[in-house]
Design a protein with these regions (language model features):
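Substrate-recognition element of Asp-dependent hydrolases with the DxDx(T/V) motif
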Residues: 91-140, 148-151
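Glycine-centered loop/turn motif at secondary-structure junctions
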Residues: 36, 85, 120-121, 142, ...
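N-terminal helical cap/lid subdomain that shapes the substrate entry/recognition surface
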Residues: 3-108
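Generic recognition of short, well-ordered alpha-helical interface segments
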Residues: 71-76, 112, 162, 226
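Asp-based, Mg2+/Mn2+-dependent phosphohydrolase catalytic module
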Residues: 1-9, 115, 129-237
Length: 237
């Protein structure tokens, strides 16, 4: 493998750094138990994330005006509860449930892997999450980024090329010496289109319970790993 010259590493956050599936499933179970509701927590969790992805893509394609991740999550949450005929939850409690996405737990390798990489490279979050969410998530998990960048800075969502190009420009780096790390092929394909290097991280249940991404030929990515801790080893070769 050709040695990669990298100075800046950008990380997707939801699913890549944080295990959204396990965290939201637990929050959904707690919510259901608290209000004595009866529904399939796995299906609800998967549909919440799928609904976000659908609205996010509409924003990125110009079919919807810009909405923050918090706003999209709330819109989808209300739709899911309406479909279940659940309409007696107070606004305050709905907001708290929606903020489950602020309380995600990181993958076991995330903190140690990021800490090691930070010793050698500039590391930055580059996420579809709004900035307030990213700050809370990082603070709650004691993750110390060099930079936190949100797609809300650019008024769109990944994989819009202007997100990646804008992020590189803000950190005064260049695309050829920047790497995007993500557990979604579409995210990395967007980074490739912007001229960046890429690293695919396998994460279970990222596209729903037991569902694998149709990621195609992984050889188009510069690195393919099972954990963050592998990235440093590859880059040092």
């Amino acid at each position: 493998m050709k040695k990669l010259k990298i100075n800046t590493i950008f990380f997707d956050v939801f699913g890549t750094v944080f295990d959204w599936h396990k965290s939201i499933r637990q929050e959904t179970t707690n919510f259901s138990s608290k209000y004595k509701l009866s529904f399939d927590e796995f299906v609800f969790t998967d549909n919440w994330r799928a609904g976000f992805r659908l609205l996010q893509s509409k924003v990125a394609n110009g079919q919807r005006d810009y909405l923050s991740m918090d706003e999209i999550h709330m819109e989808v949450l209300n739709q899911l509860l309406d479909e279940l005929n659940i309409n007696d939850i107070s606004k305050e409690n709905l907001v708290n449930f929606n903020e489950s996405w602020h309380r995600l737990k990181p993958w076991d390798d995330s903190i140690s892997g990021l800490s090691d990489l930070k010793n050698h490279y500039i590391i930055s979050a580059l996420s579809n999450g709004n900035l307030s969410m990213l700050v809370k998530l990082s603070k709650n998990s004691n993750i110390h980024w060099d930079s936190i960048l949100s797609t809300e800075f650019f008024g769109t969502y990944k994989p819009d090329p202007k997100v990646y190009l804008g992020a590189v420009k803000l950190l005064e780096s260049n695309a050829e010496e920047s790497m995007m790390v993500a557990s979604h092929a579409y995210d990395l394909d967007g980074a490739i289109n912007a001229g960046m290097k890429t690293c695919y991280v396998h994460r279970p249940n990222e596209f729903g319970t037991g569902i694998s991404e149709n990621y195609g030929d992984l050889s188009r990515f510069d690195l393919v790993v099972e954990s963050f801790e592998e990235i440093s080893g590859y880059l040092k070769k």
